Design a protein with these regions (language model features):
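N-terminus-centered regions that define maturation/targeting leaders and the start
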Residues: 2-165
Length: 165
């Protein structure tokens, strides 16, 4: 199939490198600002994006380990290719919506692990539709709404360990 470019959805950050430490400015030990994110390799037919950020290393008193959700975004417009550092609901691209994190609030809540170094997985999904208005969905409800509509997905992982216990 020569002459055709194969696009692969890629997510990057100027705030941290893939697999590297997330700077304190983006955590509970700093200003707790969302990191800068950018993406490329968007597949044809993309109508919107969704972003979920979670910590698969979170301890839970009821279980040895659980996944803790830090950020839920959806209906990022297909024309968007980046989010600047410190983006808030007021500065999101027009039409973008926030879901509920595991603190029960909306918006970015940065790393704040109680013990050890944790991984933070930034998952970006290219969707073939703009999702209907959802009532501040959590991760599970957003994933359910996206089912059957994901054209491509990618992830970027950063790590963090609290400096002050």
């Amino acid at each position: 199939m020569s002459g055709f470019a194969v696009l692969t959805l890629v997510l990057t950050s100027t705030s941290f490198t893939a697999g590297g430490a997330i700077p304190s400015a983006h955590t509970c030990e700093g200003a707790d600002r969302a990191p800068a994110l950018a993406w490329s390799g968007v597949p044809a037919g993309t109508k919107s994006f969704a972003l979920i950020v979670d910590d698969p290393d979170a301890p839970d008193p009821k279980a040895p380990q659980t996944t803790w959700v830090h950020w839920v975004l959806y209906d990022l417009p297909a024309t968007a290719s980046a989010l600047p550092a410190g983006v808030t609901v007021a500065t999101l691209p027009a039409g973008a919506r926030e879901g509920r994190n595991d603190w029960g609030t909306t918006g970015w809540r940065g790393p704040c692990p109680p013990i050890g170094r944790h991984r933070y997985v930034f998952k970006l999904y290219a969707l073939d539709l703009s999702l209907p208005l959802l009532a501040t969905p959590d991760k599970a409800h957003l994933e359910q709404a996206m089912q059957g509509h994901v054209l491509a997905q990618t992830q970027l992982i950063g790590t963090y360990e609290k400096k002050h216990k």
